[in-house]
Amino acid sequence: ALYPMAEEPLFHIHLNVDYPFNLTGILYFPKIKNNVEISRNKIQLYCNQMFVTDSVDNIVPDFLTLLHGVIDSPDIPLNVSRSYLQSDANVKKISTYITKKVADRLDEIFRNERQQLEEKWDNLKLFIEYGMLSDEKFCDRAMKFCLLKNTDGKYFSIEDYKKTIESEQTDKEKKVVFL
């Protein structure tokens, strides 16, 4: 276990990139039992292995601040105002990279271990839906691995569900209607 008194995380994401910026770290999706447990500031930011902050609002996309973990990057500007941090090119690249890595990991689990994703979906759904609403690029990627659950508890990818309902739920303009 990562923490002795905590439940196993749903899954990990390893970060390691040297170009166009330098970044290492590990992020993980915690298991959420109820809404009271959702807390931010669980990602610690380091610069050259020196603790900087656990407020990573500008570095980690808003919908991913619910993740836990550690990020280390010598390319984060220090001793600057928040407005400068927001406009720093490396910070924007790091944010985009983290979003892509999360989407890639979820897609990998969907393709290779779909049963595992279905078992964990109720815990992940909150993160993924929030991300789809707040980040267009993440939404485009998430359309591949996002799951829908029917009343019988069976999971469908959006594409599978569309194929299932297409014959019965197509309007006169030939568009599928999701109910």
What are these regions (language model features)?
Residues 1-178:
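Conserved GHKL (Bergerat-fold) ATPase module
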